[in-house]
Design a protein with these regions (language model features):
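N-terminal secretory signal peptides that target proteins for export/translocation
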Residues: 1-6
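Acidic/histidine-rich, surface-exposed loop or edge segments in extracytoplasmic proteins
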Residues: 44-52, 77-81, 102-108
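Non-transmembrane, amphipathic alpha-helical segments
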Residues: 28-35, 54-61, 83, 87-90, ...
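Short, solvent-exposed, charged loop/turn and helix-capping segments
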Residues: 72-94
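Amphipathic, well-ordered alpha-helical segments in soluble domains
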Residues: 39-46, 68, 72-75, 97, ...
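Surface-exposed, polar helix/loop patches in the mature regions of secreted/periplasmic/lumenal proteins
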Residues: 86-145
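Immediate post-signal-peptide N-terminus of mature secreted/exported proteins
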Residues: 26-67, 141-144, 148-158
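Bacterial N-terminal signal peptides
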Residues: 11-21
Length: 158
């Protein structure tokens, strides 16, 4: 009886470890890893552009940034199109939430005269975006504090 309990406990432990490790293992073997990294980087860059436009009180430009954000979201969808359905569904759910949050910032910008409410809403959008990024391995997630190439960022070698 005791040995049966020990075996069941060991199997349960192994099952738990495999269950927890499976998403991480699946996520680390993307079929298009460079495309995934590029799409995630684009999302961060456009988010930073949102912030810059709001801080500069260039509210009329914010809807254009939203359009670019949706293009970056589509790039991510394309980058993961050959991944397992379960992973794609998780990404799509969080991606839709992030896009909706950035759309709210864009919609608010039409009547904005003060950057503070937009910045508060932008912070919520960033939280939604970070929730999306949590689905990806840490080495795929871009550093939001690095400027993009061409704006003081790293230059690519030809």
């Amino acid at each position: 009886m005791k040995s049966t309990k020990k075996i069941l406990a060991a199997l349960a432990s192994i099952g738990l470890v495999l269950t927890l490790a499976a998403p991480m293992l699946a996520a680390q073997s993307f079929k298009s890893p460079d495309d995934v990294k590029t799409a995630l980087k684009l999302l961060v860059q456009v988010s930073n552009d949102f912030k810059r436009q709001i801080n500069n009180k260039n509210f009329a430009r914010v809807p254009h940034e939203f359009m670019e954000y949706t293009e970056a979201a589509d790039a991510l969808r394309g980058a993961i199109k050959n991944e397992p359905a379960d992973f794609k569904n998780k990404v799509e759910t969080r991606l839709k939430a992030a896009v909706a949050a950035y759309q709210k910032v864009s919609d608010m910008s039409a009547k904005a005269t003060d950057p503070q409410p937009l910045m508060a809403e932008h912070a919520k959008a960033v939280t939604a975006m970070n929730s999306l990024f949590d689905l990806f391995p840490a080495d795929y997630r871009p550093d939001p504090n690095l400027p993009p190439p061409g704006r003081g960022g790293a230059k690519k070698n030809p």
